[in-house]
Amino acid sequence: PEPDINFDVGSGTQAEQTAAIMIHYEKLLLENPSNLCLVVGDVTSSMACAITAQKLCIPVAHVEAGIRSGDWSMPEEINRMVTDSITNYFFTTSEIATENLRRASVTDDRIFFVGNTMIDTLLCNMERLCPPSFWNEFELEVGQYIVLTLHRPGNVDAIDAFKKMLLTIGRQTRKLPVIFPVHPRTAKTLSNLKG
């Protein structure tokens, strides 16, 4: 279904996206007061909405709180750290995430283990899933193909490293078909490889 509200921020730098989301979300909250801001995951919109809500004295609940990679070069890691630093209620997906929050001095009365909501959603909808249109065309068999996603800046922005990664994947997966839904960021790098 289509969202009720779409800020239509689009792409841009991390700062541009964050600023645009905050401006739109602040206007929305001022026109439609809320008792709670619920954010999910480690995307820029979660961080931007959490900051905006807290500035308006609206408590924040974070689903997938406490997840850490330790890689500060990832925008998602910055988003996680900032969001969790201003969250009131933490909904965690694992004991590791809960422990990460405890180490950051978050008290147990603010941490709620809920499990992996993405996997729960997938499992609840399994009967609705059907093979994609290309399933028969490529004669795919369950467990006999690989799905590849590449979109993180650290994986796709450096052309030489990206090319080396693709060649390595190609060598390692020769006997299995690779399904590669291409992210716009990745498509841009792929087009530069061709040229």
Where are these regions (language model features)?
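A nucleotide-sugar donor-handling region in carbohydrate enzymes
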Residues: 9, 86-160
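Short, hinge-like loop/turn segments at secondary-structure boundaries
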Residues: 1, 55-57, 77-81, 108-109, ...
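Active-site and donor-binding regions of nucleotide-sugar-utilizing enzymes
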Residues: 5-105
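Phosphate- and divalent-cation-binding pockets in alpha/beta enzyme and binding domains
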Residues: 47-48, 100, 121, 188-190
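Donor-nucleotide binding loops and adjacent catalytic segments primarily
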Residues: 1, 130-195
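Residues at the starts of beta-strands that form the adenosine-phosphate
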Residues: 59, 110, 177-178
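Generic structural signal for well-ordered alpha-helical scaffold segments
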Residues: 26-30, 123, 135, 170
